[in-house]
Amino acid sequence: MLAKRIIPCLDVRDGQVVKGVQFRNHEIIGDIVPLAKRYAEEGADELVFYDITASSDGRVVDKSWVSRVAEVIDIPFCVAGGIKSAEDAARILEFGADKVSINSPALANPQLITDLADKFGVQCIVVGIDSYYDKETGKYQVYQFTGDEERTKATQWETRDWVQEVQKRGAGEIVLNMMNQDGVRNGYDIEQLNMVREVCKVPLIASGGAGAMEHFAEAYQKANVDGALAASVFHKQVINIGELKQYLKQQGIEVRL
C-alpha cells in the first residue's frame, strides 16, 4: 500500500504566504522560503504553492521564489497559478518544481491538460478543482477565479462531471478544494470526497477543512484519499506534522516517518 501523504498548502500573494477563510479575507502568514523549509523539516511529504491571484490577474506565477524554494527543500513540490501554456509550465519545472497544477486555465481551455500531460508526463500534471456545495440546488458546482473575490464565479460544470473530464484529458492527480469547508477547520467533506472517489481513478487529494488530527484520519479511512492538504492548522502551529504522522500510524494508517 502506498503511504498516505501529508501536504501543507501555501497560498502566495505578493511574495508572501497568506491564508483566508472560504477563499476570502486573507491575512499574511509570513515569508515563503522559511515556511517551506520548516514544513520540510517537520516531515511534510510534499508542498503545494498556489499563487492565488495569478489567474485572475492574467499573469503566471512569480517565478523568483520557485527556485529559492527548490534550493532549501528536498521534498517534491507543486506550483499553481496562471499556468496557461506548455511554456509557462516548462519554466516552473525548470526552476525546480516537481509538478504543476492548473485550475482556472484548465476550465478556460481543457485541451491544456492534454498538452501538458503529453509534453511532461501525467505524473507532473495536477488539476485543482474548486468545488462549492450549493444548498439551494443540492449540487456540487465547480468555481473558477477563486483567488479574487470580485471575479470568482460558478462554471457550467458539476464537480463529479469535471472530475471525469479532466481524467480523460490526462490529469495525473486531482486536488479537490472544498470551498464550503475552507479555513473553517470543521473537518473535510467526507460525503463529497466519497462521491468524487467513486469516479476518480488517479490519486485524489482532499483540501479544505482540516482542524484536528482526526480529520486527517477520517479522510484516509472513510474516503480513501491518497493525500490530505491543509494550511491554517500548520501555519498557526495547531498541528505539528511529525506528531500528526505518529498519530496516524497509531490509527493503522500507512505514513512515511
UniProtKB/Swiss-Prot annotation:
This protein's UniProt keywords: Amino-acid biosynthesis, Cytoplasm, Histidine biosynthesis, Lyase
GO-annotated molecular function: imidazoleglycerol-phosphate synthase activity; lyase activity
Enzyme Commission number(s) of this protein: 4.3.2.10
Active site, renumbered: 11, 130
InterPro entries: Aldolase_TIM (IPR013785), His_biosynth (IPR006062), HisF (IPR004651), IGPS_HisA/HisF (IPR050064), RibuloseP-bd_barrel (IPR011060)
The keyword Glycoprotein is annotated on this UniProt entry: no
Catalytic activity: 5-[(5-phospho-1-deoxy-D-ribulos-1-ylimino)methylamino]-1-(5-phospho-beta-D-ribosyl)imidazole-4-carboxamide + L-glutamine = D-erythro-1-(imidazol-4-yl)glycerol 3-phosphate + 5-amino-1-(5-phospho-beta-D-ribosyl)imidazole-4-carboxamide + L-glutamate + H(+)
Gene3D superfamilies: Aldolase class I (3.20.20.70)
Compartment annotation: Cytoplasm
GO CC, one annotated term: cytoplasm
One Pfam family named in its UniProt record: His_biosynth
Domain of life from the UniProt record: Bacteria
Pathway entry: Amino-acid biosynthesis; L-histidine biosynthesis; L-histidine from 5-phospho-alpha-D-ribose 1-diphosphate: step 5/9
Main location: cytoplasm
Keyword DNA-binding found: no
Biological processes annotated in GO: L-histidine biosynthetic process
Enzyme class, first EC level, given as a word: lyase
PANTHER family (alphabetical): IMIDAZOLE GLYCEROL PHOSPHATE SYNTHASE HISHF, IMIDAZOLE GLYCEROL PHOSPHATE SYNTHASE SUBUNIT HISF/H IGP SYNTHASE SUBUNIT HISF/H
Family according to the record: Belongs to the HisA/HisF family.
Quaternary assembly: Heterodimer of HisH and HisF.
NCBIfam families (alphabetical): hisF
Stated role: IGPS catalyzes the conversion of PRFAR and glutamine to IGP, AICAR and glutamate. The HisF subunit catalyzes the cyclization activity that produces IGP and AICAR from PRFAR using the ammonia provided by the HisH subunit.
Name the UniProt record assigns to this protein: Imidazole glycerol phosphate synthase subunit HisF
Protein species of origin: Vibrio vulnificus (strain CMCP6)
Gene: hisF
